[in-house]
Structures are given as structure tokens and as C-alpha cells.
Amino acid sequence: MPSRHTFSCIDAHTCGNPVRVVSGGIPFLKGNTMLEKRQYFMENLDWIRTGLMFEPRGHDMMSGSMLFPPHDPENDFAILFIETSGCLPMCGHGTIGTITIAIEEGLIHPKTPGFLRMEAPAGLVLVEYKQEGKKVKSVKLTNVKSFLAAEGLEIETDELGKLTVDVAYGGNFYCIVDPQENFPGLEHY
């Protein structure tokens, strides 16, 4: 294995949220789906994520993506999301920033202009974009199906004590906390 690895990246942001698209030096990932490839990446190549997302090349809010050929020929491309917290199954702002960069820089070539079928580890995401000349002006995505995964779970926290929460899925799992006796609301923190 060579002692030096070179990656090409293009940085952008989505309303201030950073996204770094790795455009060169991407390794082969084993797996038949993006979910399997994500797992392989996390188990064998996480040094790439930490090297590109953390200081001195990144920062604590850095997000990024890597583009791959699709597994299904009906789709336009596949994507792996990397960030400081790990490899997300789906990332909304990362999708918007990546599509903008990828279309403007010619990294992906849509089968149907203005519309993309993107394979993410979370599943198929449909993307519409508007372009004026070479500039992408807007990106709209239809995410994977959302669902309520758990309702009324009781958890114990060090700072707040017992809380009742719901867990929802929308490409990632999210904890939903309504105001309650131990938690009056985010505006108090």
C-alpha cells in the first residue's frame, strides 16, 4: 500500500452548511448496494473520512460525499455521505450541494436533464434541479419514505433525568422531544 494517497475535492456550501465532494482518488468499495458499500467503507477505509473531514483539512461541521456508478441501470448515480460524525445513510444539504457541484462540474450526466435518480445508503432518492446555462439554480429532493419507528420511549439523561421521546426515520433516525416537565423546550438551552 502506498504511503501517500491523493484525493481531489471540490468544496461548496448549502446555505452555509459545507459539503466537500471527493472528485478523485476514490477507492473501490466492496458491496452490491450503497448500504453494503457504506458498511465496507466504515470498517476498512474510515481513515479517508477522518482525513478529509477533520482538522487540518476540515472542521467539526464538515460534510462530504463520494460519487459512484449506480447499481441499477435505471438510476443516474450512487452516493456515499461522509462527515465528522461518520457515514450517514442520507444527507439533505449534502445532496443539494453535491448535485449542484456534480452538474456544474460535469461529474454526473443525467439520463433526463433536470431529473436524477440517486442511490443512497438509505435508498432511492429522486432529485429535480433547475439549471440556467451552466449554473444550477435550485435542487428539490424526494427523500426515502419516512416513518415513526418508536413512540413514547422513556430515556434517562444525566442532565435532565427521565424524558419521553419519539423516534422517527427519514433517511436517518431522529429523536423527537416535545416540551415536558424536565425539558421546557430548546429556547431554554
Predicted segments with their positions:
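A glycine-rich beta-to-alpha transition motif near the start of alpha/beta enzyme domains, typified by
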Residues: 1-166, 175-189
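Glycine-rich ThDP/TPP pyrophosphate-binding loop and its adjacent helix/strand module
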Residues: 171
